[in-house]
UniProtKB/Swiss-Prot annotation:
Zn(2+) binds at residues 36, 39, 55, 58. Residues 32-288 form the CoA carboxyltransferase N-terminal domain. The gene is accD. GO terms for cellular component: acetyl-CoA carboxylase complex. One of its GO terms (biological process) is fatty acid biosynthetic process. Its cofactor is Zn(2+). Its EC number is 2.1.3.15. This is Acetyl-coenzyme A carboxylase carboxyl transferase subunit beta. InterPro entries: AcCoA_carboxyl_beta, Acetyl_CoA_COase_Trfase_b_su, ClpP/crotonase-like_dom_sf, COA_CT_N, Znf-ACC.
């Protein structure tokens, strides 16, 4: 039930105040509204959720959790999660890492920055992973790499496609070189999956950067992106500081990359499930 909207009197300067009138403005609770960062319009959170967290005014795609991503993409009651119990450890005794992990687990309710499993999309069975942007910015550590590599190996054994939703700030610095090794490990699993004639569709969401972009995010047979997704290795500011030149408008955004052949398609969130279902159908995946 919605809370009763409160009002407060607008304080006016003496020279502007009308003795016979009082002015009031609505003061809505913060839990009901938010501001779109792109068009600056005020949005009802309930209406935004009904539209899959896409702004109806400008089409801005808000970031969503991995659990919600799977919920809006996979057919009801078909998803079976794998390796949920795996958790990262502070193998390098990096200062503050244990506390960051505990906080991330408590705030997100997830054990790691990726969810992996098998389900159906429009009736077609596939392996699915979705990275979690709210768990240490979707950073890739040993457990993230292990879970995704295991999923590709499982998909290879079952001869089913993989649909992967990427969102990440890159390799997890608290795990040092071990996090970078996950790039090679996952890439090897992707290659074996491909060598067996299986399909891999990578869906890039905002932002997909760092070691994730430099490995499995760009290894898909078909590479799709949501609109206006930031895709790159180093960030724009780092590049500008390095080359000491201004970057072109839209640099590293999905539309910029699409024009230059790095992407196969840009698909809005509302159309994505149907789009993926059509791809699975066209690649002769048996519906069950």
């Amino acid at each position: 039930m919605l809370k009763k909207i409160s009002f407060k009197k607008l304080e006016l300067k003496p020279e502007l105040e009308n003795k016979n009138e009082s002015t009031i403005i609505p003061c809505a609770p913060k839990e009901l509204l938010l501001i779109c960062p792109k068009c600056k319009k005020t949005l009802l959170k309930s209406e935004l959720a009904d539209n899959l967290d896409v702004c109806r005014e400008c089409g801005y795609h808000f970031r969503i959790s991995a659990r919600k991503r799977i919920g809006i993409t996979v057919d009801n009651e078909t998803f079976v999660e794998y390796d949920r119990e795996l958790r990262s450890k502070n193998i390098l005794n990096f200062p503050g890492y244990d506390e960051k992990l505990k906080t991330a687990i408590k705030e997100n309710g997830e054990n790691e920055a990726v969810i992996c499993g098998i389900g159906k999309i429009e009736g077609f069975e596939c392996a699915i992973f979705a990275m979690e942007p709210f768990f240490m910015m979707g950073s890739m550590g040993c457990v993230v790499g292990e879970k995704i590599a295991r999923l590709f190996e499982l998909a290879t054994d079952k001869s089913i496609p993989v649909i992967g939703f990427t969102v990440s700030g890159g390799a997890r610095m608290q795990e040092g070189i071990m996090s970078l090794m996950q790039m090679a490990k996952i890439s090897g699993a992707v290659k074996r999956h491909s060598n067996n004639g299986n399909l891999y569709v990578a869906v890039l969401t905002d932002p997909t950067t760092g070691g994730v972009t430099a490995s499995f995010a760009m290894q898909g047979d078909i590479i799709v992106s949501e609109p206006d997704t930031l895709i790159g290795f180093a960030g724009p500011r780092v590049i500008e500081q390095t080359i000491r030149r201004s970057l072109p408008d839209g640099f590293q955004r999905a539309e910029f990359l699409m024009e230059r052949g790095f992407l196969d398609s840009i698909v809005g969130r509302n159309e994505l499930k149907k789009y993926l279902g059509n791809i699975l159908m066209l690649h002769n995946v048996e519906a069950r």
